[in-house]
Regions:
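Glycine-rich and small/hydrophobic secondary-structure elements
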Residues: 7-10, 33-45, 232, 237-269, ...
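Short helix-loop-beta junction
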Residues: 6-13, 178, 390-397, 556-572
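Short coil-to-beta-strand
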Residues: 175-184, 220-229, 585-592
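A glycine-rich phosphate/pyrophosphate-binding beta-strand-loop-alpha-helix module
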Residues: 193-278
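Flexible gly/pro-rich beta->alpha loop and the following alpha-helix that scaffold active-site loops
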Residues: 561-564, 569-595
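Intein/HINT protein-splicing elements and their conserved insertion hotspots or analogous self-processing inserts
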Residues: 46-177, 189-192, 216-218, 249-251, ...
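Glycine-rich phosphate/diphosphate-binding loop of Rossmann-like nucleotide-binding domains
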Residues: 541-562
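Anionic-ligand anchoring segments at beta-strand to alpha-helix junctions in alpha/beta enzyme folds, i.e.
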Residues: 2-29, 393-404
Length: 595
């Protein structure tokens, strides 16, 4: 598949004796069709081949010249004995393939709804917070370097305790500018089981309510922020595994297409894995739930304005709830239902795409105005989870929540707390109270003031009419973290996971700078571009070499740092030293980066 697409326009011949084969027992069919990962096919002009080979050798990247273009519109694999186990006209492969007609029927699935009582709120919340979709991802984020490139403007962990709570990731475009790129994810597998169309819409909605916290760059042709976002859809589906699955996929794709068209969004790329089922010799079949994972990406106008989900412990501020869905609060397809062993059939969706876009653009405008102090999306786990997560990364403080003004047909506290209708919670200073009220009213956006911070209490107190309940933040933080500990325990040794679980909240970030420190070159009388000036100073610069090996990272930002400090910087690989291409004779300092 990889090599054939490279020569689609001209044809080509692959010499199978030149392919790196690790298992000599593989048949020709297995060699041609295997899906070994971490490989890349390149089509290179013959005159540049030696240059590319030298680069590959320097970087220790295994490179194999396995074939050539032919110009005869045929694509073939040739064995050492001259036999061609594969030889087709490229037109047969790409140009004239017949359309696949898939016939299916609609199969109605009705899943039992949930029954519950407000007397078990603590038990419900404890179980919801431990489900993997909601629980802490510390076990995962601790396994990656979150600073490589030196351009990471928004990484996973947030707040004093540095918990993985970020809604989106943001990377700067360069070391000195304000622009960047944001990305976020969304998926709704449980909702997709109950209603494939609603699951697709919720996946898109979650991805957008995650990326909304980064100020999206706009232009004259696309003045609304939401129009400047691109999506990627990864379809994970058990096609042809049972009656009705292909129909569900069709409905899901149609719903996503319609929703994105209504929002003015582009989905230029994606991926699919449409055979997610496994049948065993005894006839048993395991079928994965069909879902779509939506990735959103956009240019960021100012990486310094990205909103954090961590609540600011300012008693003179308020938290506002904004519902993007324009739908009734429903528990079908929610984590709450899953926690009770149910799925439910009453699934929320986005009733009015135009209103959703208006809400998104309104939040973007508030970010540009600088009015939002903190913000978080409402998705897995519902409103109560979003509010708790806004407090988890703090060592002190809580909030008082009043649900009285949330519009609903009934006074169902459980729905208010656990429904996963797309929406957001924002924190705004009380001095902007009148401004925010006028802004939302002028833009036709419904909003509800639901909470205010309580800096002296580590509780979330929820009230509605005669109902009142306290949730202990410290206890629930440990509950939320427990799943991460249990997963990490399987992957680490010597009780390190237990130590992490015991101490993670006892080491908050507490950074103190000298009063004179401003974090700018200007404050030291320095100009970042001073080395470009033609004043002869560049000839006096000492030389530093960054020694790297395959797997080294962090070398690019180190090179920039050294250059900024006044060094000429050389990139030196171990192969340079071994081959004698580099002797380090003119080097004054060497640096080894991690990897």
């Amino acid at each position: 598949n990889c090599l054939s697409e490279l020569v689609e326009d001209c044809g080509g011949k692959i010499d199978m004796t030149r392919l790196p084969i690790g298992d000599k027992t593989l048949s020709a069919k297995e060699i041609i069709a295997n899906e070994s990962q971490e490989r890349m096919g390149l089509l290179i002009d013959e005159q540049h081949l030696d240059h590319v080979k030298r680069i590959a050798e320097r970087e220790r990247a295994p490179m194999y010249v396995v074939g050539q273009t032919t110009g005869d519109a045929h694509f073939s694999f040739v064995q050492g004995d001259g036999v061609k186990p594969f030889d087709l006209d490229v037109a047969q492969m790409f140009g004239h393939s017949p359309k696949t007609v898939m016939t299916d029927v609609t199969v109605e699935h009705h899943y039992e709804g949930v029954t519950y009582t407000t007397n078990k709120l603590d038990s419900y919340l404890k179980d919801v917070l431990q489900l993997e979709a909601v629980a802490c991802k510390d076990w995962l984020t601790n396994k990656v370097d979150r600073s490589v490139t030196g351009k990471v403007a928004r990484q996973q962990t947030q707040g004093e305790i540095q918990l993985p709570l970020s809604d989106c990731g943001v990377v700067a475009l360069d070391y000195r500018g304000k622009k960047g790129i944001a990305t976020a994810l969304g998926h709704a597998p449980q909702a997709g089981m109950a209603d494939a169309a609603a699951g697709s819409v919720l996946s898109v909605a979650e991805s957008l309510t995650n990326i909304v916290w980064a100020p999206i760059a706009t232009d004259q042709a696309h003045p609304c922020a939401i129009e400047n976002i691109n999506l990627s859809a990864n379809w994970m589906w058990p096609c042809r595994s049972q009656k009705g699955e292909d129909t569900r996929l069709y409905n899901a794709v149609q719903a996503l297409s319609d929703f994105c068209c209504d929002l003015g969004l582009n989905v230029p790329t994606g991926k699919d894995s449409l055979s997610l089922s496994q049948q065993y010799p005894d006839g048993k079949k395991v079928i994965a739930p069909g879902t779509v994972i939506v990735t959103s990406g956009a240019e960021v106008s100012d990486i310094r304005k990205v909103i954090s989900p961590v609540m600011v412990n300012d008693k003179n501020s308020s938290l506002y709830y904004i519902d993007f869905s324009f739908d009734k609060q429903r528990l079908g397809g929610s984590v709450f239902a899953q926690m009770l062993g149910k799925i439910g059939s009453d699934v929320p969706t986005v009733k009015n795409p135009e209103y959703f876009a208006d809400c998104f653009n309104a939040i973007q405008e508030l970010i540009q105005k600088g009015w939002i102090m903190a913000g978080h999306d409402i998705s897995a786990g519902g409103l109560i989870t979003a509010l708790l997560e806004m407090t988890f990364a703090n060592t002190t403080g809580g909030m008082h929540v009043n649900l009285h003004d949330i519009m609903q047909d009934d006074d169902d506290i459980v729905k208010m707390l656990f429904a996963e209708n797309p929406g957001v919670v924002i924190q705004v200073s009380d001095r902007r109270k009148k401004d925010v009220k006028k802004f939302f009213e002028d833009n036709g956006i419904g909003y509800t003031k639901i909470a205010y911070p309580t800096p002296d209490k580590c509780l979330i107190t929820v009230v509605k009419d005669d109902f009142k309940h306290d949730f202990d933040i410290d206890t629930l933080r440990d509950t939320w973290y427990k799943t991460s500990f249990l997963l990490d325990r399987r992957q680490s040794m010597n009780g390190m996971a237990q130590k992490r679980y015991t101490n993670y909240k006892k080491q908050p970030l507490d950074i103190h700078f000298n009063p004179s420190f401003k974090g700018t070159l200007e404050s030291y009388g320095l100009d970042a571009g001073r080395w470009k000036k033609e004043d002869g100073i560049s000839t006096k610069r000492p030389c530093a070499a960054i020694i790297r090996e395959k797997g080294t990272n962090g070398d690019r930002e180190m090179a920039y740092t050294l250059w900024l400090a006044g060094f000429n910087v050389k990139d030196v690989t171990m192969t340079d030293l071994i081959s004698g291409r580099e002797t380090l004779e003119e080097v004054n300092m060497i640096v080894f980066c991690g990897g």
